[in-house]
């Protein structure tokens, strides 16, 4: 199963927190000390906590669970999308729309509209419209794709959230808490760990660190899914006998 070592984390700068004046005292148990007014995260805590989170995500994936990757900060946006797509999962990487989970009924209608517009753009419907109407629908399609493209094939609520930056994505975390969906999150020294089921104390800004987390999560999800496919193949083989 995918794991991450302390050496990997040091190389990626996972241990660098935020400036000491921005700290959240609830993160004290995970802070090693401070250097040049910047908090240093205790990787002896982070390594086992991250590997425990990976093991749990592996289990969820092996049960066909759906994992939603959330990271809407510009720096993490593309990496979040790439990681989710690489393991056939789902993502929100631009803006978290309030009610995305708690108001799923409405979101489902917007997804239906998105799919209708996609069909229209491909089957020649747009070509039959006036220039103005076609432009309006194209803009609507782009807007919906931007906000819902990563979840349009999710087909229902996710079984877990993997979040980059608990502070920035606090609305998503709150919605998941309300619905009892487990939250796995990178929590920096300025963030509140409350509401996060699997806290991963670490740098949430450095792109190398973010890429390290996402790469490991995507790998463990792929492994979990292949276990599920292998067991399905075994079952059908037994039935065939």
Swiss-Prot record:
The GO molecular function terms of this record are: structural constituent of ribosome; zinc ion binding
Q: Any one Gene Ontology biological process term?
A: cytoplasmic translation
Is Ribonucleoprotein one of the keywords?
yes
Query: Which UniProt keywords are present, listed alphabetically?
Result: Ribonucleoprotein, Ribosomal protein
**Cysteine disulfide partners in this protein:** none
User: Which sequence positions carry the modification called N6-succinyllysine?
Assistant: 115
- List the GO cellular component terms: cytoplasm; cytosolic small ribosomal subunit
**What Gene3D superfamilies does this protein's entry cite?**
Glucose-6-phosphate isomerase like protein, domain 1 (3.40.50.10490), Helix hairpin bin (1.10.287.610)
For this protein, the record's NCBIfam families field holds: rpsB_bact
Describe the family membership recorded for this protein in Swiss-Prot or TrEMBL: Belongs to the universal ribosomal protein uS2 family.
Describe the task this protein carries out.
Required for ribosomal protein bS1 (rpsA) to bind to the 30S subunit.
**What subunit structure does UniProt give?**
Part of the 30S ribosomal subunit, contacts bS1. Some nascent polypeptide chains are able to cross-link to this protein in situ. In collided ribosomes contacts ribosome rescue factor SmrB.
Q: What is this protein called?
A: Small ribosomal subunit protein uS2
Source species taxonomy: Bacteria, Pseudomonadati, Pseudomonadota, Gammaproteobacteria, Enterobacterales
């Amino acid at each position: 199963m995918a794991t991450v070592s302390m050496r990997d984390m040091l190389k990626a700068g996972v241990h660098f927190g935020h400036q000491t004046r921005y700290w959240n005292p609830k993160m004290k148990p995970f802070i090693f000390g401070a250097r040049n007014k910047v908090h240093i995260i205790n990787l002896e805590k982070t390594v086992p906590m991250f590997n425990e989170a990976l093991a749990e995500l592996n289990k969820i994936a092996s049960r066909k669970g759906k994992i939603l990757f959330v990271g809407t900060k510009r720096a993490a946006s593309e990496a979040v999308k790439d990681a989710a797509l690489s393991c056939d999962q789902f993502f929100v990487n631009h803006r978290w729309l309030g009610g995305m989970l708690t108001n799923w009924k409405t979101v489902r209608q917007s997804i239906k509209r998105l799919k209708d517009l996609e069909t229209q753009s491909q089957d020649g419907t747009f070509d039959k419209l006036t220039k103005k109407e076609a432009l309006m629908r194209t803009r609507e399609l782009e807007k919906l794709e931007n906000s819902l493209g990563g979840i349009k094939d999710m087909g229902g609520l996710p079984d877990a959230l993997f979040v980059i930056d608990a502070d920035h994505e606090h609305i998503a975390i709150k919605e998941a808490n309300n619905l009892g969906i487990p939250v796995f999150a990178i929590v920096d020294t300025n963030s509140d760990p409350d509401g996060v089921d699997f806290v991963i104390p670490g740098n949430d800004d450095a792109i190398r660190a973010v890429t390290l987390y996402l790469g490991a999560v995507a790998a463990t999800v792929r492994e979990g899914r292949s276990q599920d496919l292998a067991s399905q193949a075994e079952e059908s083989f037994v039935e065939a006998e």
